[in-house]
């Protein structure tokens, strides 16, 4: 089953230090706990517009590269942004994991002052694609509502609400098919 942590994933916190407004790395805490509980492979799909440097640092420090598949939007070269849908779907379709931890960054929005290049519709597509492909593969998703620096805050909340609606939409479709 899917789950949501309406918090940030804290992906900038490194092994030895807090960084980039992140005190500890919740994505990695969750990933390690899931592995300790018996999962063979965890995927972290980080769609915050900034590179999840702390997440990668901890994966490297703990030598978890074979156990954790880390894909981060922040590492996508600018030249590939127009091809995001193709690149993202390719990654989702090849993904093989027991659980997906999804950082649904609102700062990827084109009007975000600290990054962003995605339209609202592209972000909706991003969320729908992730939840739909994972549902088809029967891979549970736990997502966080990260990033987002637009003012007024209502704009960020609307983007997070879209992620939640897409997750629920896919859940309802799956329930009807069963």
Language-model features: where?
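A general "terminal functional-core" signal
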Residues: 1-178
């Amino acid at each position: 089953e899917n789950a949501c942590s309406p918090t940030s994933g804290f992906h900038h916190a490194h092994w030895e230090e807090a960084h980039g407004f992140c005190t500890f790395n919740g994505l990695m805490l969750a990933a390690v706990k899931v592995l300790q509980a018996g999962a063979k492979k965890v995927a972290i799909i980080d769609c915050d517009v900034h590179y999840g440097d702390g997440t990668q640092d901890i994966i490297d420090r703990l030598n978890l590269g074979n156990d954790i598949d880390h894909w981060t939007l922040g590492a996508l070269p600018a030249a590939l942004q127009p091809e995001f849908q193709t690149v993202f779907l390719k990654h989702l379709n090849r993904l093989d994991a027991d659980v997906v931890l999804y950082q649904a960054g609102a700062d990827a929005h084109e009007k975000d002052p600290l990054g962003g290049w995605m339209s609202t519709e592209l972000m909706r597509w991003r969320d729908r694609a992730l939840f739909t492909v994972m549902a088809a593969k029967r891979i549970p998703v736990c997502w966080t509502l990260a990033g987002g620096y637009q003012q007024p805050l209502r704009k960020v909340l609307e983007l997070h609400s879209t992620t939640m609606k897409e997750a629920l939409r896919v859940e309802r479709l799956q329930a009807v098919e069963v």
